[in-house]
């Protein structure tokens, strides 16, 4: 009887320790916002993906940076992509707006800036085009790109492809007029 009781106590202790570690990790997870996300493009003009937690592989981050760099050089669109675990208040829309306002993403005259925020553990994202892009990149196109590139790849657990395919689709949109993705099926 005492041996069974001792094993149960060990199992209960192990379960309690496991649950405590999960809650501790969640409590210490950083809530990212426009103030504490390092803006890599301010230190290196060839970098556009803000990935302070190193969620993406270096090679895929470089490939994504290359597409965004081409977007700026060929179409005059400055873009900032952010990928983090959590954003403040679970609100990527607010974080994207705050980044655009705080750092002035895009040319001041044309307002052709773009901020994309992906918060993996919050399971949320937002594509925020500047006012100067809204005629060229509609809300419907932003939603199609987000669902086909970000949501689809995040469901597969592939943040690298979520960011790279988004950069490719947006680059294609401004280079050819088409995103190169099929519009997601309704329903």
Model-predicted regions and their roles:
Residues 9-11:
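Classical eukaryotic N-terminal signal peptides for Sec-dependent ER targeting/secretion
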Residues 14-22:
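Bacterial N-terminal signal peptides
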Residues 4-7:
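Short, positively charged and aromatic/hydrophobic N-terminal segments
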Residues 29-187:
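Folded, non-transmembrane soluble domains that reside on the lumenal/extracytoplasmic side of membranes
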Residues 23-28:
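Hydrophobic membrane-targeting alpha-helices
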């Amino acid at each position: 009887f005492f041996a069974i009781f001792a094993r149960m106590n060990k199992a209960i202790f192990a379960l309690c320790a496991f649950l405590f570690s999960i809650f501790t990790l969640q409590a210490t997870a950083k809530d990212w916002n426009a103030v504490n996300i390092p803006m890599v493009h301010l230190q290196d003009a060839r970098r556009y993906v803000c990935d302070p937690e190193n969620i993406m592989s270096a090679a895929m981050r470089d490939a994504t940076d290359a597409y965004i760099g081409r977007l700026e050089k060929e179409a005059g669109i400055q873009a900032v992509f952010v990928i983090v675990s959590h954003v403040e208040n679970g609100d990527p829309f607010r974080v994207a707006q705050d980044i655009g306002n705080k750092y002035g993403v895009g040319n001041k005259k044309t307002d052709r800036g773009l901020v994309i925020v992906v918060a993996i553990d919050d399971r949320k994202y937002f594509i925020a085009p500047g006012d100067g892009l809204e005629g060229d990149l509609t809300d419907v196109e932003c939603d199609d790109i987000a669902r086909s590139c970000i949501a689809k790849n995040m469901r597969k657990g592939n943040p690298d492809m979520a960011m790279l395919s988004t950069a490719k689709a947006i680059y294609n949109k401004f280079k050819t007029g088409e995103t190169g993705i099929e519009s997601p099926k309704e329903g």
